[in-house]
Amino acid sequence: MSEQTLNYLQEKVAHANQQGQVIRITGSGTKDWFGNKLQGEALSTKEYSGILSYQPDELVITVKSGTSLKEVEEALAEKNQQFAFEPPHYGEGATIGGMVASGLAGPGRVSAGGLRDFVLGVKIMNGQGQIMNFGGTVMKNVAGYDVSRLLPSSMGTLALLLDVSLKVLPKAAATATVSVAMEQSKAIHLMNLLASQPWPLNASAWVGENAGTLYLRLSGAKAAVQSATSAFAKTYGMQTMDADEATVFWKSIREQTHSWFISSDQTALWRLALPSTTAALDLGGETLIEWHGGQRWHRGSLDPKAIKALAQSLGGHASVFRAKEKSEQMLSSLKDHPLTAALVVIEERLRKSFDPKGVFATGRLI
């Protein structure tokens, strides 16, 4: 079946290349709302699925792009392993291809790294229907640029991802979540202070409801986690959450099902990537902070040019994440940053080397 599906995909891409058509790669559609508006004829990878190989001792798994993310995570859990960057699903049926194409990561990214850091190798189909392989199945030094790292966050605009090899990590021996009521500026300072010290700090979140609450997830050796929880309770008055409640909480942050995300879904949700030590921002709306201050979510009616200019002046960038009505002005682009203007030319040359006729030029990524 997979060989037939591969042939079908190859025929569709080759035909689109000949006819000058645009193809929009899709899996289960759980992230159709992400990025720019949908354009092009949908080409599903759902039938191209399956785990090709899994070597727990080598900490590597190779899967086809249409494979269910849930299926892969369950296979990893059986061996007490995980994707440490905690990819969000955003709905039932999320696929590995969508995970890679979106490049999104959950609370654990701040300590483990992003998805791109875990990609070892890929098999792709370019805009002419040719199959290409990059990278491998082990971490090693490579000569030149590791092309496989280009696929994460490319939103399907560079090539059709077929197979991907990913590094996995063992689950921690112990995990605990502590929390304390704290206003935003103090929370930002404390997150960065603790992150600079040898504590087993795995994730953090500040939820701006009422006076605000700071949540810290500790993960590592049992003795280290116990030492940290005791120290934080004594020094900062932090309380340890029930383990099941903590699991539900962090999943709600990862999947954006927490009440903060759904209570004001009539207004646009902005995502600001900033230096973690950036001071608290008064943007006139609601704020939720992750990644020790490096990722800030904001609900409110903001002027796109103003919020993007503010983020840039602080050394970061801003883009709308969810909104009922999106415009290109609301999305982050290389063109917004004068210092990276030269990269626009390089990016265009790179795209054309993989996709000369723009088969995958859907405009999802601007």
Enumerate the predicted regions with their spans.
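N-terminal glycine-rich flavin-associated loop
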Residues: 1-23, 45-92, 104-137, 172-180
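A short linear hydrophobic-aromatic micro-motif
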Residues: 22, 84, 200-205, 285-288, ...
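C-terminal substrate-binding/cap subdomain adjacent to the FAD-binding core in PCMH-type
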Residues: 101, 120-263
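Short, conserved charged micro-motifs
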Residues: 70-72, 185-190, 223-230, 277-284, ...
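Conserved glycine-rich FAD pyrophosphate-binding loop
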Residues: 4, 38, 91, 239-366
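Residue-level signal for inorganic ion chemistry
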Residues: 27, 216, 298
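Short glycine-biased active-site loop of nucleotidyltransferases that positions the nucleotide triphosphate
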Residues: 32-37
